[in-house]
């Protein structure tokens, strides 16, 4: 396996390559910009240095590479070459548990860092984040009490007890609260006719309803879960006139009224928003003549109702996002199927937000909250606050298995107690007017953060010893600073010896790089043998011969350097995370990261922040859709094995959470969910057939529907096996006996037939018994001659 290089090493190599490119070309950038002061020299490039030594040999440029200045015998102590640096100011170690006091719980390290950056330079620093165990949790349940949620209200009357029981498996310090909303109590959102409809909006439905209200805070966060149940039982529904609700008003007030709600500083904040309808957004208030924008402040009165409901417009998504981030609140949209796609879109615009599908009667809200909390705790995503305009940041994430993922500022699939780290490169563009600024980096939903104090090192130390009206500058015509004269208005020359009023045509040849070329590039005047560049409405003209400017670079979509870089003498110098001739190609890869944890789902290449699908049949923003791909089922099969059965390659490598981010739902049977569904079947290690379906809805939510029970071959019946074995033994014995008997019979028959055959062939003489011998015997005497 190829070794992974740390993000810092990659960044360092890239930086060295960039700096080398500055000097390897045809000319030295430090000596070709026509600078005449130390401050200008440092702004040319991070590789440039300035020599303030008065004894520097004549003709040697004071702005040069440091090694060149040393070769020119510039004293080392006279060289101005500030180096960007990072210094850790505070770094408490990360905590392992969250059961201590707030001051003892640390989830982000370091906490404070100081950066010193010279113009156009960058510095890399690291940040570690850990989700500690047993961290306190605050859950505020915000419910839609419009008439359509009547059955849901009865379903959550015991939610407090059940929720506490489930959440205490994850934390020993839980508090829950309750609030309700309907919509702004003003026409056209409410019924105003007939008059009795104001007090009882359900007058024509033979039901009694509460008068319509905007938002009311019912129960402050408490660890007494029985009180939650009691307060919920006291609630009744109301009724509004139009379909959308005023939920965003309620979210805003529940977020910013931290004292009323009781949010703790040292706890995870979960705001559960339940509804079955759309919601009004900013500018919808104009339907009721409400034009005052939402101010994002707390307006809960002594009666615990939202007092500005009829005078202030609904909040915008941007304002909600800002306030949720400031208060470290994770929003959970628990909404019904008919509006889930809308709230899925909202969640993409609000960091730290999750969406769950609520059943029609809210019976699954308990599991939904627990699952949503698990998703929140399994993800770490960084956000940046108050970043100076002149700074740009680029991120590299080291999540699981110490794998560095360039361009990513989030990690998913984490377990409680896991530690992740981020390598962050801060790069400054130019020289900001404010020399000291600060910004904050924090994980979404965390109270812990990293404060970065930045000092922009734009000045030279030798400027502190400047001599105004110095005799060295032609009897006081300028300030002697850093080894050169900075001439007063109206004076020019290296020693301020030439007045602008003087004019000698013979000096004009010194204002042209070559004979025959325009003087001062036709963008300046030659005074005393020195180019004085014109001012321009488009930008700044610089250079020894006025050959450079900051406005003549290429444009892309109407913006110079695509809006992602600076123009430096006709060339685009791209910001961090951007590259290309036009600076229009981002180097970030987080936009190419698919839900399975792979860049472009492993089916394409990430080019300029977008996936270019290369596998035939694949499509989608991250090449995630590919019904005809051979890996559509094989990869998801590994996720099913890992997440449902806790086995398989991904489980053994502990990468299940990273590569398998789809929701898994168990079903009894697979149904036809449309053309975006892919049915898959495989045999597991137990030789059982597992069937599942991969489905992606219109909102982009991917789900794996897995049949609860795999189809396994039935095991043998023991009794049948025993009887079969015994029967087989008996049959074999009987068969053996029969065969033996048959063989014996055949053998006997053959012998008997042989006997009969031999007996039939026998020829016996029946006249004499060959065994009988007569009593007399007759012998003939051969010698007897008859005499």
Swiss-Prot record:
Glycosylated position list: 345, 396, 477, 584, 679
Residues annotated as transmembrane: 718-740
UniProt short sequence motif LIR, positions renumbered to this chain: 776-782
Knocked-out gene: effects: Animals are viable and fertile.
Source taxon at top rank: Eukaryota
Keywords: Calcium, Cell adhesion, Cell junction, Cell membrane, Cell projection, Disulfide bond, EGF-like domain, Glycoprotein, Integrin, Magnesium, Membrane, Metal-binding, Phosphoprotein, Postsynaptic cell membrane, Receptor, Repeat, Signal, Synapse, Transmembrane, Transmembrane helix
UniProt: Mg(2+) binding residues: 146, 148, 245
Residues with PTM Phosphotyrosine: 772, 784
Mod. after translation: Phosphorylated on tyrosine residues in response to thrombin-induced platelet aggregation. Probably involved in outside-in signaling.
Coiled-coil annotated residue ranges, if any: none
Domain I-EGF residue range list: 462-497, 498-547, 548-584, 585-624
Stored Pfam families: EGF_2 (PF07974), EGF_integrin (PF23105), I-EGF_1 (PF18372), Integrin_b_cyt (PF08725), Integrin_B_tail (PF07965), Integrin_beta (PF00362), PSI_integrin (PF17205)
Disulfide bridge positions per record: 30-48, 38-460, 41-63, 51-74, 202-209, 257-298, 399-411, 431-458, 462-482, 473-485, 487-496, 498-528, 511-526, 520-531, 533-546, 548-569, 553-567, 561-572, 574-583, 585-608, 592-606, 600-611, 613-623, 626-629, 633-680, 639-660, 642-656, 688-712
Binding, Ca(2+) 2: 183, 240, 242, 244-245, 276
GO terms of molecular function: C-X3-C chemokine binding; enzyme binding; extracellular matrix binding; fibrinogen binding; fibroblast growth factor binding; fibronectin binding; identical protein binding; insulin-like growth factor I binding
Cell membrane found in the keyword field: yes
Signal peptide: 1-25
Domain notes for this protein: The VWFA domain (or beta I domain) contains three cation-binding sites: the ligand-associated metal ion-binding site (LIMBS or SyMBS), the metal ion-dependent adhesion site (MIDAS), and the adjacent MIDAS site (ADMIDAS). This domain is also part of the ligand-binding site.
Record-given protein name: Integrin beta-3
Organism per entry: Mus musculus
